[in-house]
Amino acid sequence: MLDVTTFDELRIGLATADDIRRWSHGEVKKPETINYRTLKPEKDGLFGEQIFGPSRDWECSCGKYKRVRFKGIVCERCGVEVTKSAVRRERMGHIELAAPVTHIWYFKGVPSRLGYLLDMAPKDLEKVIYFAAYMVISVDEDARHEDMPGLENELRLEIKTLQDQRDSQIAERLGRLETDLAALEAEGAKSDQKRRAKDGAEKEMGQTRKAFDEDISRLERVWEEFRSLKVGELKPEDAVFHELQDRFGIYFEAHMGAEAIQKRLEAFDLEAEGELLREQIATGKGQKKIRAIKRLRVVSSFLATGNSPAAMVLQVVPVIPPELRPMVQLDGGRFATSDLNDLYRRVINRNNRLRRLLDLGAPEIIVNNEKRMLQEAVDALFDNGRRGRPVTGTGNRALKSLSDMLKGKQGRFRQNLLGKRVDYSGRSVIIVGPQLKLHQCGLPKQMALELFKPFVIKRLIDLSHAQNIKAAKRMVERSRGQVWDVLEEIIRERPVLLNRAPTLHRLGIQAFEPQLVEGKAIQLHPLVCAAFNADFDGDQMAVHLPLSVEAQAEARILMLASNNILKPSDGRPVTLPTQDMIIGLHHLTTLKEGVAGEGRAFSSVAEAILAKDQLSLDLNAKVRIRLHDIYFGEGEAPEGVELDEKGKTVGPVLLETTLGRALFNETLPVDYPYIEAVADKGKLSEIVNDLAERYPKVEVAAALDRIKDAGFYWATRSGVTVALSDVLTPPTKAAILSGYEKQAAKVQGQFEKGLTTNAERRQELIEIWNKATAEVAKAMEDNLPADNNINRMVSSGARGNWMQVRQIAGMRGLVSNPKGEIIPRPIVHSYREGLTVAEYFISTHGARKGLADTALRTADSGYLTRRLVDVSQDVIIREDDCGTSRGLDLPIATKGADGSSVRDSNVENSVYARSLAADAVNEAGEVVAPAGSDVGDVMIDHLIAAGVHEIKVRSVLTCESAVGVCAACYGRSLATGKLVDIGEVVGIIAAQSIGEPGTQLTMRTFHTGGVASADDITQGLPRVQELFEARTPKGASPIAEAAGRITIEDTDRSRKVILTPDNGDEPHIYPVLKRATLLVEDGQHVELGQQLHVGAIDPKEVLRVKGVREVQKHLVGGVQGVYRSQGVPIHDKHIEVIVRQMLRKVTVVEHGDTDLLPGELVDRARYNEVNRATLTEGKKTASARQEVMGITKASLATESWLSAASFQETTRVLTQAAMEGKSDPLMGLKENVIIGKLIPAGTGLAKYRDVTVTATEEAKAERYPNRIFTDESVFNESDLSFVDFDSFSSDDYTPGTYN
């Protein structure tokens, strides 16, 4: 059936004024919201019912029409349509602006799209838009050219007239001066008076000359401006411009504000501009070419989409529905309102004032000021604070604009579309439930009743315990007896989901069958704690209820805890026995010498148990017990024991073992080889690993439960306790320390005599004290008796490690100062002895730094996970096989000194769980395994035994699927151990596998004993981030750009490494820091890509010099290096998925005859497709350069604008996408979650949506043992959808419902 939400693409574009008017249901003319007396929305206001619909269902504003029977009528009195009030969530209004305004996203975003289109600097744009300068819109070139001679003559004439006037006025004044001087002479005036008269006249003449000269120069400037006038020029508002407008206004048009921009955009010829820019790109160089490329990108997007650039200037502002910007009455009668209403109010007020001023014909300066204020009001509405100071509300808080509603963690995308709260859920504290089976959890009765309430109510009515819903509800609220019976029936075989935050990987949500328990705490199976990273110190967990039959099926089949035994990150079991269980099993399987019953023989385990109960036999005594039908692994059977072909003993066998070990083996499957060893942490891990490989999950889960039960049982009986007397300080400690004290004093003495430097002294002291600490630790371990409880806990792997014991019983050792440098004086006391004040003080630095670091790490690791998920969320298994013959050559073994093959230590996480891309051939040239074979543990052993050292395996890095990856290249799913299914979201699993252990990685750089040096290499989490972001590392080492010979030039100030290539090219010069440690010597021959000094390498350089395969190796190896150093196993294929995403784009260098733009980033798949099409037409193909992008940049460069916008830089992404008229193909997960569709992965894939399931008779009988369906009208199979396993929810099918 087709759904309304079934569409393939989602496009975003630029809305024109007509679009906005089409969406609108009326114009908002008044800034009023709600009438304070009647509390009804004001007419034509921001909440007007005439525009947005009635505020009460089926009722007009004046109350003339009430009830649903008047549906669709528009009241003639108040003008309100009678309909549901829900329309107030979807009906929009609009504001008709009295003057156009620019959209701030297009003008102020970086880069400024308007600026690129009009080829203007953002500064100049701002001057025009905010009324600080005029912009020339058009010039009538023909008329100007035609009239130029006449106008020039006129102007010259005017200038001549002015000059004549000036000269005549000066001459007249000179004449007057002479007359005055003659008169003064006649009067016999003093020389002072004459001089004053002369000075006065000269001053007057100067002023006259200056005034005339200014007029003449102004005319000349006006003329020059007129002659050189061109479109797009900016003119300040001054006398020259006003004169220019008065004199030559008919030849040109100049405007201010958004109106100017609008007129320019309307007259803009996109095609001509595109041609011009292509020409510039072909001929230009440097900055000019780069700018032309950027401008062409903007021009092309408008040409391609048919969007009108004039839509970037608004004449109409849309008003969003009132329910999305609500106004609510508070208790005190005051109102709380959304900030948007204030911002809309400002726009309406200013718009109305401007309209009034225009009607009154106000002076231009006042009108312009009002237009500028309107522009600022609309800016604040769209993106408050983007330009100038933000508009603030009460308490100086910046108001939340439309952009802020979308941005960030609290924005619409991340808060409401990607993370919704769900119904049918609860949360409570967790406690341990050791009696549970692996697939069960304990659900508090009250909680279960609340969660299943609707189902309980329905069942009560079906069973006639209640007549109607109200009565049933009352029964539930009063907790009647029948209610619990019904709840018990409903809950049977109905899975619930348990989730513990933070959900770092997919094992953070698992399904369990609930068991009703008393109390209010959820009971959790102890073996699943590791997957949830849960402990019982107050952790809480949430419970969710899968409702539909499909959801229940998925929960039971895919998410049940007993089906999730393996970790998706490395394929190893996650449900390992821990702590109490380990100590119990260790106690059970230990062998003790000289204890009761040693050497006795028993006819059966039962007889041995009897002897133990009678206290004549110790659990750990070495005895002989007759056992039947036991299995042994290859070469493990005792001498003289006969085995059949399956490894099973023929007849009974008298086995030398302990009773404990015999009991332990009873917990394992019948045909599992007999374990004759101490079950410590390592051994148990091996056993569980083996079980997971050999047996179906049901069998493994049962065995794990038996192991768990045995562990707890014997832990209780082992009586393990800890007292202070168990912490034994080694008696030789003082003697050991005094010896090292002497050595330290000697080193200090040498330093004081000036024989060694401070750095050498520190280094030597650190080495001395490290040796001392190690020796004390060794003495302490030797001093602890084997049956010491602390020793048992640590050596069995149940809890703690020797370092912790050493600090309690031996000595604390060296600690570091706040800078991270090691203090060369150790803490010689242990916690058992107590620390001195100074020792306590210096040890607090490290402890506090540890806590601060952990807090930082958690946040950093979370952000890394988010970026990884974002970049890889559309990597889904899309096909079975892409058909490529490419692959990676990976080592599986090396040749030992004796010629034998030594297994490579990283095989588990490199070639394991993949398939061969080519035949595996040994040195003799024999094919050991054909291409396409699955590489598992058995196959690896087989290959190594046959002498194969390197194999070529399929990898996602070489997969040629256009979208997602193929199953053959990915290989086995590590979580199931089988070939990955189509629809598996391998991208997100990869991101979780890398991100989940992120918190365990150390922070910052490591300092090598003391002062920071160039050897400080970024490690831990920051290094992983540096690699995934493809950043140039700090102090990056250059790599040889060709094979050649090295020359080192050393001067006082600097050092250079010069590489002379073998092929006679120009030498390459690398400046190197003086303190850097070189890896090459003078005169040495180096190969292409060889590192020149100690430090990290820039991935971009590796790509440029050595190519794609090498940069892939560099990134995968670098990330693995960090995780391995922390002992965290992650399979290479997860890192490869991310690296594939980092390398999927290419930059177009030459566009040839394709429609690609030079400098454009395109998907490699699209680039190849375009080139293929161009080749078939016989045209010139494009050429491109491979790019390595950081994960943040790669996430933003995705094809999906929805995914990019919900990740980061929301406004920038949306601006660009709207301008380009982008279509979202809805291939990834996020975009489908945002629009509320099923994700195109797993069971949400289209191919899995049309499966019909029919229930067998057996299944029906199983579900309803007490009912017989004979009546066709009651139970018509064609009306139902069934799931072919025995777990229907009890409320799904009830007689009498489906007729």
Swiss-Prot record:
Residues in a coiled coil are none
GO process annotations (BP): DNA-templated transcription
Stretches the record annotates as Disordered: 188-209
Q: Could you say which enzyme class this protein belongs to?
A: transferase
* Keywords of this entry: DNA-directed RNA polymerase, Magnesium, Metal-binding, Nucleotidyltransferase, Transcription, Transferase, Zinc
Mention any one GO cellular component term assigned to this protein in its UniProt record.
DNA-directed RNA polymerase complex
Q: Gene3D superfamilies under this entry? A: 1.10.132.30, 1.10.150.390, 1.10.1790.20, 1.10.40.90, 2.40.40.20, 2.40.50.100, RNA polymerase II, clamp domain, RNA polymerase Rpb1, domain 3
- Entry binding sites for Zn(2+) 2: 882, 959, 966, 969
Q: Does the keyword Cell membrane apply?
A: no
Q: Which GO terms describe its molecular function?
A: DNA binding; DNA-directed RNA polymerase activity; magnesium ion binding; zinc ion binding
- What catalytic activity is recorded? RNA(n) + a ribonucleoside 5'-triphosphate = RNA(n+1) + diphosphate
Pfam families xref list:
RNA_pol_Rpb1_1, RNA_pol_Rpb1_2, RNA_pol_Rpb1_3, RNA_pol_Rpb1_4, RNA_pol_Rpb1_5
Which SMART domains does the UniProt entry name for this protein? RPOLA_N (SM00663)
In terms of InterPro entries, this protein maps to: DNA-dir_RpoC_beta_prime, DNA-dir_RpoC_beta_prime_bact, RNA_pol_asu, RNA_pol_N, RNA_pol_Rpb1_1, RNA_pol_Rpb1_3, RNA_pol_Rpb1_3_sf, RNA_pol_Rpb1_4
This protein's cofactor list reads: Mg(2+); Zn(2+)
Q: What quaternary structure, including any partners, is listed in this protein's UniProt entry?
A: The RNAP catalytic core consists of 2 alpha, 1 beta, 1 beta' and 1 omega subunit. When a sigma factor is associated with the core the holoenzyme is formed, which can initiate transcription.
Physiological role: DNA-dependent RNA polymerase catalyzes the transcription of DNA into RNA using the four ribonucleoside triphosphates as substrates.
Q: Which NCBIfam families match?
A: PRK14906.1, rpoC_TIGR
Any idea what this protein is called? Answer: DNA-directed RNA polymerase subunit beta'
Organism annotation:
Clavibacter sepedonicus
